[in-house]
Amino acid sequence: MSQQIGFIGLGIMGSPMAGHLARAGYQVVGYDLVAASLAKLEAAGGRRASSIAETVEGSSIVITMLPADPHVEAVVLGEDGVFEHIKPGTLFIDFSSIKPGTSQKVAKAGTAKGVRVLDAPVSGGEKGAIDAVLSIMVGGDAADFEAARPIFDLVGKTSALCGGHGAGQAVKAANQLVVGGTYALVAEAIVLMEALGVDAAAGLDMLAGGLAGSRILELKRASMLARDFKPGFRIDLHHKDMGTVLDAARQADVSLPLSLQVAALIQAARAQGLGNLDHSALLAVIENLNGLNGKGQ
């Protein structure tokens, strides 16, 4: 009989990740509040659960992929949560992007119960999850990382143990400040080129092929030019992540002036009602600052 994995959180990222594991032959038991997400898992060969307890029961590996710190604390540490039902020796992997301190709190609680805990936030967005090419930043013990490597190899392209508990979240925070900054600069480049009457599509092709090239330019330049901001990763979630960045900077007593600017732009996006759009919608914020209505108009 194949190994059973309990997977809690089948949203934009969790759904394709759980599907990869089910198609690889794992017995995946999934739990989510959205019925359509459970149906997707069943279509991939998994099984739906009706509660956290049912998801955890019989699972030698338990995975969570949740939006933010309060969700992780409630689902994992709360009443009738994961740690009330999990057995000693179980490998617990949290793919959520949360504060390092929250991951350390989860690890402390899990260790007290004999649970092997890893924080393993990911980068790559919805497309990365669908294509199983995520970058996975891991915090925890080396032996537990090696035990989880087969899982990481099925849902991602690269994974690395970055340090002890919470280290994965620290690296994810750094990732998010780079991603947010890159989106903001690409947005400004588009606005500048269009204001100067340049063929912005040709211009971005040139940027993508030179030193300014990035994964964001590779994957997002066409949709940004089309002002297609269908969410792969929502502004609201990036706002949460920038809060993590700034909290970490205060704790480390370091100055990150550009991160403050990026956080302000993301907050402006939310104030303009763009929170449910993709983080590439920072382009709309830059256009609004310049009195434009898309494509330099």
Regions found by a protein language model. Name each.
Residues 1-65, 90, 95, 126:
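NAD(P)+-binding Rossmann beta1-loop-alpha1 motif at the extreme N-terminus of oxidoreductases
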Residues 5, 10, 97-180:
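Rossmann-fold dinucleotide-binding core
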Residues 28, 48, 116-118, 159, ...:
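Hydrophobic beta-strand scaffold residues
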Residues 52-64, 68-116:
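Rossmann-fold NAD(P) dinucleotide-binding segment
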Residues 131-132, 136-139, 160, 164-196, ...:
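Active-site-proximal catalytic alpha-helix in oxidoreductases
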Residues 151, 201-208, 260-264:
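Beta-strand segments within the central parallel beta-sheet cores of soluble alpha/beta enzyme folds
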Residues 165, 213-279, 297:
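Interdomain hinge/lid region at the active-site interface
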